[in-house]
Amino acid sequence: MKLRYMIIGAGGVGGPVGAYLSKSGADTTLIERGKHLAVLQEHGLTLVSGENERESIPVKAIDMDGFLAAREQGAPAPDVIFVCVKGYSLADTVPFIRKAAGRDTVVIPVLNIYGTGRALQAELPELLVTDGCIYISANRIAPGVIQKHGAICRIVYGLPSHKIDHPVLQQVETDLKNAGIDPVYSPYVERDTLLKFAYVSPNAACGQYYHAKAAEMQHPGEVRDSFVRLIKEVVALADKMGIPLESRPGELVERNLRILDALAPTASTSMQRDMEAGKQSEVDGLIYQVVRLAEQYGVDVPEYRKIAEAVKKQTENK
């Protein structure tokens, strides 16, 4: 089965995914805009990793209007759409997806925010929308150029039905493997996306509170201790939500510390970078949402409350 892929957003998440799929020979179209799009079209996407190792990969890229114009002229719909935008931009993709998709198009959101798949499915009831997330540390450093921090690139996706027999999603698993991406077609995707959130949310919260990059969190001390406390609070919240994340106490802390310690020392979260630049960020979904859920489920999250209050003051003072 030969699938046509669309990647909405070619930044630190969608850029590498689109580049790897394109390099493997998969029919892949990246949706972007502005200067980033112009460079992608002229020079391809450049991935920078390690000690300034650079690889430029030819990609097919277009903006939303251009793709819809092509659809009106008879261009085929994508079989699979990976949604790789920031959480605050998710709603903006819905009208485009409605027009770009075909009847059998499958939508796979891989955002940082927990519950994205359910939210998108409610907006697109006519399409099949999975839950999903991605493990990657990368960011755009210039138009057409993505800096990777570490080798990990894992996409987790699946359906609330717990079934893993959908032929398109099975083919996605094969195509991702062929592209050098680690796929997890999960029968327990709600748990697995919350597992990802239990890493990225503490990482973003701790990093923003202490203005710390990975290096400060990779060594014993207050910053690393805070990261651990945040993980434990998400675990407690998940237990109250009926989605246990651990088979034994401390398991998730150990797992997340291994992920953290494998990052380049210069790595930081996209939320931190956006907040430092005064841009719109995912702070609501990554920090404040945990406090709201804790109130809803009656869970004490003192570390999150402390950080949420401090971050609100930081933003109010800017």
What positions do the PLM features span?
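Active-site-proximal catalytic alpha-helix in oxidoreductases
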Residues: 190-218, 222-235, 260-261
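N-terminal glycine-rich dinucleotide-binding loop that anchors FAD/FMN and/or NAD(P) in oxidoreductases
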Residues: 45-64, 200
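NAD(P)+-binding Rossmann beta1-loop-alpha1 motif at the extreme N-terminus of oxidoreductases
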Residues: 1-54
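Rossmann-fold dinucleotide-binding core
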Residues: 76, 112-196, 202
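Rossmann-like NAD(P)(H) cofactor-binding subdomain of soluble oxidoreductases
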Residues: 57-145
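NAD(P)-dependent Rossmann-like dehydrogenase/reductase catalytic/cofactor-binding core
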Residues: 2, 178, 228-318
